[in-house]
Amino acid sequence: MAKRVSILDQHKKPSSARVRVAVRLRPYMEKEDEKAPAACVRGLDSQSLEIVNWRNQLETMQYQFDAFYGDSATQREIYMGSVCHILPHLLIGQNASVFAYGPTGAGKTHTMLGNPSQPGVIPRAVRDLLQMTRTAAGGPENENWTYTITMSYVEIYQEKVMDLLEPKNKDLPIREDKDHNILIPGVTQKTINSFGDFDEHFIPASQNRTVASTKLNDRSSRSHAVLLIKVQKSQQVSPFRQLTGKLYLIDLAGSEDNRRTGNQGIRLKESGAINSSLFTLSKVVDALNQGLPRIPYRDSKLTRLLQDSLGGTAHSVMIANIAPEQKYYFDTLTALNFAAKSKQIINKPFSQETTQSIAALPAMKRPREEAETAAGSRQRKKSKTDSTESSPNTSMDAASKRKLNLAALDPAVVERLLKLDKILTEKGMKEAQLLSTPKRERMALLKKWEESQMEIERLKEKQKELEQKAIEAEARLEKSTNSDCNLSDSSVSECTFRAPLRGRNTSTAKAKKVLRVLPMQGNSQLQSTIEEGIPVFEKKKKKPVSCDGRENQPTWEVNVRTDLLESGRERILKLLNTGSVKELKSLQKIGDKKAKLIIGWREVNGPFKNVEDLASLEGISAKQVTSFIKANILSIIAS
């Protein structure tokens, strides 16, 4: 059962937490600006900046935020000043989010990822989070608590949520549970115990993100990337509380002006999807600031995923990245206006706590449920059951009766009973889990268990009957087989084989399979040769008849006489050396082309010494020569 707990007190309303907005100015690149050497943005102090008013060049517009970082600010300053303070909220079951916003080429990915010498927000946050959980787990107040950290990494590409840890080319759905938590069913989750584990999963996954080159950015992100770090704090003793905090680290794709980027084809389609989702994001911010009854979170996958971060239950930090060049003036102005509106959004963080309760107190039971329970117990008493099967019901009824008097007991006695229940739970006794089950569910489970036991007994009896029938059928088969095998070879005209019936459902024997010894059939020429008294085949050996159930085994072996084979080979060789094209074509596997090849080879190299010399011809292999001999030997002998 999930409980939503406030930051300060469970019985008070949740405290409000405004979205904190920080602005980072990218260093000025003189080589990119062809119009003017001066920057269009200038920082005033650590929280405010000014930009030239495009309507009146003599005026400037000032903006104030939670933090402003100039072009000389380091990655560490940004992380320590705006991000690290939200991480402790994860250890008490609250959500947090950090997302980078700004036009293309303003440095969002550098702020979130960085490089090996200057790591960004993501690696620093993961490293500190791992260190915080190790420190908290070693404290005496968390002796019975364990911490588990998992990560998921997805991208929103053309309004499709794609898994980056295990790419499947499948659009993942975004769902909302009964406690209004946003989740992605089916997304890959990897457990991380050290920063090395994180690097092992994150670096290959980052290479799966879609990037491309445009006129404004050599490595432009074509999708929104979302890294989800989940921290789960679990209590190992009763009441087994569980606190779950989620950290969203989001690198948004930048808005693009296709007239300047020169996007075409697939890049134009990607740019349209990016601009559409960012426009929906601005509509969500406007609706939250105006207090509208409907917030268009569902109009885009991006805003649906950011629902917790904007007007939801997370501690949110937005880092707006801007560029100082004159050609980015309107992009910078749009980003500053969006950041100014975002800092007015109010979130209401809660601790997401799940408690595995012990047994529900009987005082909380409704009168109707008590009446149904009593009626069910009276009906069970009237039913006829075995004494052994009724003993669990009796013990559980007694336990229920003891629970009914719990509210009337002395508080000290109640406390001792709860301690005893805790001891039983820690020892892993099955009865503790059984007592925590509602009575109606308990009786339904027992009824199903009894029915399954009866079904098992019926199946056992049926199995015994089938085994007995199989044994009887096997005995009859063995007796019949022995009588058949005792017959003499001269009187045997057929041998009957029966398959054993072990495992069959019926005792009826299978139909007999008969193997008959049939006379060998040959062609007319071969038959006439045999009738003339020239024995072509000689009898080698008769195999014994086997009655072990193997069928289709020949009982005779025959060999062709070797002198006839040699005679046939000589006649084939003679035909190869003296035959014309027509005579050669009368041989099997010899056509017009091969006949001409044989005559040509014979004219150049002289007569063949043996039939195997055919392999010397172009296009005739040794395997084909063997096939040629087999195909012609019998017909040559019979002719």
From Swiss-Prot:
It holds the Pfam family HHH_3. InterPro entries: Kinesin-like_fam, Kinesin_motor_CS, Kinesin_motor_dom, Kinesin_motor_dom_sf, P-loop_NTPase, RuvA_2-like. A motif (Important for regulated proteolytic degradation) lies at residues 549-552. Residues 358-400 are annotated as: Disordered. Residues 439-484 form a coiled coil. Ubiquitinated, leading to its subsequent proteasomal degradation. One of its GO terms (cellular component) is nucleus. Residues 388-397 have a biased composition (Polar residues). GO terms for molecular function: ATP binding; DNA binding; microtubule binding; microtubule motor activity. Keywords: ATP-binding, Coiled coil, Cytoplasm, Cytoskeleton, DNA-binding, Microtubule, Motor protein, Nucleotide-binding, Nucleus, Ubl conjugation. The keyword Cytoplasm applies. Its main location: nucleus. Kinesin family member that is involved in spindle formation and the movements of chromosomes during mitosis and meiosis. Binds to microtubules and to DNA. Belongs to the TRAFAC class myosin-kinesin ATPase superfamily. Kinesin family. This is Kinesin-like protein KIF22. It comes from Xenopus tropicalis. The gene is kif22.
